[in-house]
Amino acid sequence: MDNVSIWAIVDAAAEPDIFTMLDTLDPPHACLYAEPVTDEILGVAPFLILATPDVLAWLKVRRPPWGILLESQASMTTLRQHLRKYLHVLLPGEKTPVYFRFYDPRNIWPLISVLSPWELHSFLGPINAI
Protein backbone atom coordinates (compact mmCIF):
# COMPACT_ATOMS: atom_id res chain seq x y z
CA MET A 1 0.00 0.00 0.00
CA ASP A 2 1.28 3.43 -0.91
CA ASN A 3 1.61 6.25 1.59
CA VAL A 4 0.49 4.28 4.63
CA SER A 5 1.20 6.18 7.83
CA ILE A 6 1.29 4.91 11.37
CA TRP A 7 -0.73 6.99 13.81
CA ALA A 8 -1.03 6.83 17.58
CA ILE A 9 -4.06 7.78 19.58
CA VAL A 10 -2.61 8.70 22.95
CA ASP A 11 -4.82 9.27 25.97
CA ALA A 12 -3.59 12.27 27.97
CA ALA A 13 -5.47 10.92 31.01
CA ALA A 14 -3.32 7.77 30.92
CA GLU A 15 -0.12 9.44 29.71
CA PRO A 16 0.31 12.93 31.20
CA ASP A 17 3.85 13.23 29.76
CA ILE A 18 2.27 13.55 26.31
CA PHE A 19 2.50 17.34 26.43
CA THR A 20 6.25 17.30 27.07
CA MET A 21 6.68 14.85 24.20
CA LEU A 22 4.57 17.00 21.86
CA ASP A 23 6.59 20.10 22.79
CA THR A 24 9.93 18.31 22.40
CA LEU A 25 9.35 16.19 19.29
CA ASP A 26 6.67 18.39 17.65
CA PRO A 27 5.07 15.65 15.53
CA PRO A 28 1.94 16.43 13.51
CA HIS A 29 -0.90 15.99 16.00
CA ALA A 30 -4.46 17.02 16.82
CA CYS A 31 -6.75 16.67 19.80
CA LEU A 32 -9.73 14.49 18.93
CA TYR A 33 -12.05 16.74 20.92
CA ALA A 34 -13.63 19.68 19.11
CA GLU A 35 -12.29 23.15 19.78
CA PRO A 36 -12.37 25.05 21.98
CA VAL A 37 -11.01 22.67 24.60
CA THR A 38 -10.42 23.87 28.16
CA ASP A 39 -7.09 23.11 29.83
CA GLU A 40 -8.90 20.81 32.26
CA ILE A 41 -10.41 18.75 29.43
CA LEU A 42 -7.19 18.89 27.40
CA GLY A 43 -5.47 17.08 30.27
CA VAL A 44 -7.67 14.02 29.75
CA ALA A 45 -8.20 14.25 25.99
CA PRO A 46 -7.17 11.78 23.29
CA PHE A 47 -4.62 12.99 20.73
CA LEU A 48 -4.08 11.74 17.19
CA ILE A 49 -0.32 11.82 16.59
CA LEU A 50 1.72 10.89 13.53
CA ALA A 51 3.90 8.06 14.84
CA THR A 52 7.29 9.20 13.60
CA PRO A 53 10.30 7.04 14.56
CA ASP A 54 10.93 9.36 17.53
CA VAL A 55 7.31 9.13 18.67
CA LEU A 56 7.39 5.33 18.34
CA ALA A 57 10.58 5.20 20.43
CA TRP A 58 8.90 7.39 23.06
CA LEU A 59 5.79 5.20 23.10
CA LYS A 60 7.87 2.04 23.43
CA VAL A 61 8.96 3.05 26.93
CA ARG A 62 5.50 4.17 28.08
CA ARG A 63 3.38 1.97 30.30
CA PRO A 64 0.03 0.75 28.98
CA PRO A 65 -2.74 1.72 28.58
CA TRP A 66 -1.45 4.86 26.82
CA GLY A 67 -3.59 4.21 23.72
CA ILE A 68 -3.39 2.44 20.37
CA LEU A 69 -1.51 2.48 17.08
CA LEU A 70 -3.23 2.34 13.72
CA GLU A 71 -2.30 2.40 10.04
CA SER A 72 -4.05 4.53 7.46
CA GLN A 73 -3.54 6.15 4.09
CA ALA A 74 -5.94 8.94 5.07
CA SER A 75 -4.89 12.46 5.95
CA MET A 76 -4.89 13.56 9.58
CA THR A 77 -7.98 15.68 8.92
CA THR A 78 -9.92 12.76 7.42
CA LEU A 79 -8.80 10.37 10.15
CA ARG A 80 -9.64 12.82 12.94
CA GLN A 81 -13.07 13.47 11.46
CA HIS A 82 -13.76 9.73 11.24
CA LEU A 83 -12.50 8.92 14.75
CA ARG A 84 -14.47 11.75 16.36
CA LYS A 85 -17.70 9.89 15.49
CA TYR A 86 -16.88 7.29 18.14
CA LEU A 87 -16.07 9.57 21.06
CA HIS A 88 -19.67 9.46 22.35
CA VAL A 89 -22.07 6.54 22.63
CA LEU A 90 -25.62 6.21 23.82
CA LEU A 91 -26.02 3.52 26.44
CA PRO A 92 -29.23 1.49 26.55
CA GLY A 93 -31.83 3.23 28.68
CA GLU A 94 -29.91 6.52 28.75
CA LYS A 95 -30.98 9.78 27.16
CA THR A 96 -27.62 11.50 27.13
CA PRO A 97 -24.52 10.22 25.29
CA VAL A 98 -21.44 9.39 27.35
CA TYR A 99 -17.75 9.59 26.46
CA PHE A 100 -16.39 6.35 25.01
CA ARG A 101 -12.67 5.77 25.28
CA PHE A 102 -12.48 3.43 22.28
CA TYR A 103 -8.74 4.21 22.01
CA ASP A 104 -8.06 2.52 25.35
CA PRO A 105 -6.60 -0.92 24.56
CA ARG A 106 -8.81 -2.35 27.31
CA ASN A 107 -11.84 -1.21 25.27
CA ILE A 108 -10.86 -1.51 21.61
CA TRP A 109 -10.28 -5.27 21.48
CA PRO A 110 -13.52 -6.27 23.25
CA LEU A 111 -15.38 -3.81 21.00
CA ILE A 112 -13.88 -5.20 17.80
CA SER A 113 -14.60 -8.78 18.90
CA VAL A 114 -18.37 -8.17 19.03
CA LEU A 115 -18.79 -6.15 15.83
CA SER A 116 -20.33 -7.78 12.78
CA PRO A 117 -18.22 -7.66 9.59
CA TRP A 118 -20.22 -4.66 8.33
CA GLU A 119 -19.98 -2.86 11.69
CA LEU A 120 -16.23 -3.48 11.75
CA HIS A 121 -15.91 -2.17 8.19
CA SER A 122 -17.86 0.96 9.18
CA PHE A 123 -15.91 1.43 12.40
CA LEU A 124 -12.55 1.14 10.69
CA GLY A 125 -13.46 3.38 7.75
CA PRO A 126 -10.13 4.76 6.47
CA ILE A 127 -8.11 2.68 8.96
CA ASN A 128 -6.18 -0.22 7.43
CA ALA A 129 -5.10 -1.88 10.67
CA ILE A 130 -5.08 -1.39 14.44
Model-derived regions, located:
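Terminal low-complexity "docking" segments
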Residues: 1-101, 105-130
